[in-house]
């Protein structure tokens, strides 16, 4: 069984399969990493690596960072469209429609997780689980590396954040012990690098200029990672721009962010009390600035893939959680979940600590109440949902047992509310309203219907042009007997007219173009139809010849008779699908008809000869048998009769024994 892991980061998205111990799926261009960007251009949207044209008009249609832009409806719609694009990439790579596990940041809480699940369900995105990204990386490490220590620390220096995770790995069971995140990554470094270039060369402080510089940042950073000075030519304006940046300039520009990361790493080491070899991953980990910062703080190694680890780990993690495998993964809640009765001035009761397991044992809380009440569910001290427990008022208090659990998506679930008397309850977690979900679905359909229509228009025009271009030569080579030069010239003129017609904007317009071209070629269609009718009639006559032969000689079986049976089947199969029109005339092969007609004639004659030969053989055999019977019934001579009598007399005496 296959599982797919998806890491939708703020910079890039990676799709991986659990096949082959972790295999990355490429996009329509075959690239392993898909840029997390979308452009709502018309008539066709652009996604990922297809977003290439940096012009002012397209920038206003461009969106990024879908994962972390879930605070409003616009962000929901953008994420939904990008998820649907990712779903199409998955389906292009595998026909099995496998379950999907998505990696999410450690700071994703109840609201973000539920938004993600609601959008996935609306988009028919087969999301079956969420896993914290640092846990996915740890899973990847355990599966790919031998002799993993029983406890290890990971640092993921990513694009928009930096995450640390401490894990235990005993008896092939992986469990997170500690997680921490700071919202600082290479994104902030990149913005400062762009600022240096803009200010140093007095460039226009526009979004377009920043986008053009952004496309060259990888080259600049790669150079700075190996040399103290980068000298590069950028094409930002009409004239090429010579850009010179030093490591020192870059270091000073990101000084405050480096300080934040330095403090973050120090706090993680102090809080975990870890003193072993640290594993470092993430795209920002290759920066000379990060290497300098880590050099005097920890002993570390970089042995995992800096880009694909999260997606592969998510796929492998879901496989390990769903199947009986050698490895087992337990993710943790990552935040504190508590409850309290609404309106009561009491401290909340903690039911799930941050280090408790997702899909772990449920927690049952008992309340002794006489009447209905409302429970507030809190996440790190903030109310995220309510549970309205409705019971009839009684004189005596009754025990009401409420069962809570953390589901596969890391969200709080109410399993049951039980009481010895009748009780009802309504759980009200955060969810996107049905109206908003319908709007999200309608937004995707609006764009997708137009794109599919455009694809259909392109397919229709391509089919029409292919037919028109090749029709003249096909008629000349295969149907020269039923067409003349004037007709062939007309066909070629129609093809030229087609290429002068503008591209249609709607399917209806393209259908009008198609009907116009076909009407001009109606005289050819009539000739082809007449030819087909004549060929069908001719083949049916040959069928009748075989059937008449079978009626006359049905009881006589010869090799050629069996061959005729096979030819009859061939003709029937050919006639089932035999069609001749403008679009398949190039594929028509008259030789089959000529060969099968010739074979029928040949084997009819051979069958007649074989039957005649069989008849003569039977006559010869009959004469021979008659001759043998005549010899055995011939009258005995007088001498033979007397001799026989003498023998009979002798035999009467010879049979006596002593």
UniProtKB/Swiss-Prot annotation:
Compartments where located: Cytoplasm
Record's keyword terms, sorted: ATP-binding, Calmodulin-binding, Chaperone, Cytoplasm, Nucleotide-binding, Stress response
GO cellular component: endoplasmic reticulum chaperone complex
Pfam families in UniProt: HSP70
Annotated GO MF terms: ATP binding; ATP-dependent protein folding chaperone; calmodulin binding
Acidic residues bias spans: 642-658
Biological process, per Gene Ontology: endoplasmic reticulum unfolded protein response
InterPro entries per record: ATPase_NBD (IPR043129), Hsp_70_fam (IPR013126)
Region ranges (Disordered): 614-658
Bias type Basic and acidic residues, positions: 614-627
Family assignment from sequence similarity: Belongs to the heat shock protein 70 family.
Purpose: Required for normal growth at various temperatures.
Name used for this protein in its record: Heat shock protein homolog SSE1
UniProt organism field: Encephalitozoon cuniculi (strain GB-M1)
